[in-house]
Amino acid sequence: MQRALLSSLRRSAGIRSGVNSMRVVRPTVLAPRMSMIRFASTEASKKEGKEDKAEAQGSQEPETAAETNKEAEGAKVEVSEIDELKAKLTKKDRELADMKNHYARAIADFRNLQESTKLEKQKARDFALQKFAKDLLESVDNFDLALNAVKEDTLKNNSEVKNLYDGVDMTRNVFEKTLARHGIEKVDPIGEQFDPNQHEATFEIAQPDKEPGTVFHVQQNGYTLNSRVLRPAKVGVVKDAEN
């Protein structure tokens, strides 16, 4: 009986000691496992962090690329708008230059038209006056012929003839002044060189005391209309004695 009781006590003590040894040993055995679990979790978290970072970078890269594309497109749009504005400005400058050119030509044409119209009116006026003046010149010529027909002795001895002569001379002067107001002037070429554009030679006589080619006698007075020859003077010209 005692032996059986001792053996049972020993067994129970052994079992307890084994349990205690297991309790003591278990933490030592589990420590490496926990460290491995922690390492694995750390690696997993690192891997997940890298993956998240990569995903974030991957998500950011398309956004950055999209923003870059938008900026590039915006820059292209701005450049195209600037080019379009430059083209419009150049076109407007050309149109403005053309308008200025047309305006200058229009002004020049208008001034030329004014000048030509003025000249045409003056020509028409001169032509009408020329025809009328030529008819009046015959009357003036008759006054000259009448006055030249009276001799000086008659004027000295006959007062009535003298009064008539003075009246005819005054009438002639009135005619000449009236013609002068309209640009018609008498030409007296005595002593001038013969000019075929203004004079008409009716005869030539050699005179030793006068220079050849000069006008020494006026048979009919000449007249000009606004400095143009209305009627050439009929004159006698000194002839060269050697010819």
UniProtKB/Swiss-Prot annotation:
Ranges of compositional bias, category Basic and acidic residues: 44-55
One Gene Ontology cellular component: PAM complex, Tim23 associated import motor
Region described as Disordered: 42-75
InterPro entries membership: GrpE, GrpE_coiled_coil, GrpE_head
Gene Ontology MF annotations: adenyl-nucleotide exchange factor activity; protein homodimerization activity; protein-folding chaperone binding; unfolded protein binding
Principal subcellular localisation of the protein: mitochondrion
Keywords assigned by UniProt, alphabetized: Chaperone, Mitochondrion, Transit peptide
CDD domains according to UniProt: GrpE
Subcellular location: Mitochondrion matrix
GO biological process: protein import into mitochondrial matrix; protein refolding
UniProt-listed HAMAP family: GrpE
Quaternary state and interactors: Component of the PAM complex, at least composed of mtHsp70, MGE1, TIM44, PAM16, PAM17 and PAM18.
PANTHER family in alphabetical order: GRPE PROTEIN, GRPE PROTEIN HOMOLOG, MITOCHONDRIAL
Protein family (similarity comment): Belongs to the GrpE family.
Role according to the record: Essential component of the PAM complex, a complex required for the translocation of transit peptide-containing proteins from the inner membrane into the mitochondrial matrix in an ATP-dependent manner. Seems to control the nucleotide-dependent binding of SSC1 to substrate proteins.
Name of this chain's protein: GrpE protein homolog, mitochondrial
Gene label: mge1
